[in-house]
C-alpha cells in the first residue's frame, strides 16, 4: 500500500520525504530501464550473447543511470555544505540535493539487491552485504545529520 505524500511528510518530516521520494523514483527508474533493456534493446544488441553475458550486460546498462546522475548531485551538494567549518562539517544538515543523491543511490541499491538475488551470476555475499548496509545506514546517517561527508 502506498502512503499518501501528506502522511509521509507529517510523520517523517520534509528531509525524509525528499529522501523517500528520491529512493522510490530511483528504484522505479531502474526497474523501467531493466524492462526497456530486456524488452527492446537486448533482443537487438545482445541477441548472440550467452546467458551469463546477458546478466552482466543488463546489470551494467541499468547501473549507468545512478552512476551518471548521483555523483553530480553529490558534488553539487558538497559545495552547499559547510565543509570549511571543521567543528560542524560531520554534523551538518543535508541539503535537498544531498537527500536526493542519497535517495537515488539507495533506490538503485535496493533494485540491485533484488537483481542480485534473482541472478546467481551476480549473487555474492559481499555485494549483498554492501547493498543492505548502505540501504540501512546511508539514510539513517543522512537523516540524523551524521557523517554526511562520508555518506
Regions found by a protein language model. Give the residues of each.
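Membrane-helix and juxtamembrane interface regions of eukaryotic multi-pass membrane proteins
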Residues: 1-151
Amino acid at each position: 500500500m502506498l502512503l499518501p505524500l501528506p502522511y509521509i511528510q507529517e510523520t517523517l518530516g520534509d528531509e525524509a520525504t525528499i529522501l523517500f521520494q528520491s529512493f522510490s523514483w530511483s528504484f522505479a527508474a531502474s526497474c523501467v530501464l531493466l524492462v526497456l533493456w530486456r524488452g527492446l534493446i537486448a533482443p537487438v544488441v545482445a541477441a548472440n550473447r550467452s546467458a551469463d553475458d546477458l546478466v552482466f550486460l543488463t546489470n551494467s546498462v541499468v547501473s549507468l543511470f545512478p552512476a551518471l546522475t548521483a555523483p553530480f548531485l553529490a558534488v553539487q551538494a558538497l559545495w552547499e555544505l559547510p565543509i570549511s567549518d571543521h567543528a560542524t562539517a560531520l554534523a551538518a544538515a543535508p541539503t535537498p540535493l544531498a537527500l536526493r543523491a542519497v535517495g537515488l543511490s539507495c533506490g538503485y541499491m535496493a533494485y540491485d539487491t533484488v537483481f542480485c538475488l534473482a541472478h546467481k551470476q551476480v549473487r555474492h555475499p559481499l555485494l549483498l552485504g554492501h547493498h543492505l548496509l548502505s540501504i540501512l545506514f546511508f539514510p539513517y546517517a543522512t537523516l540524523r545529520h551524521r557523517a554526511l561527508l562520508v555518506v
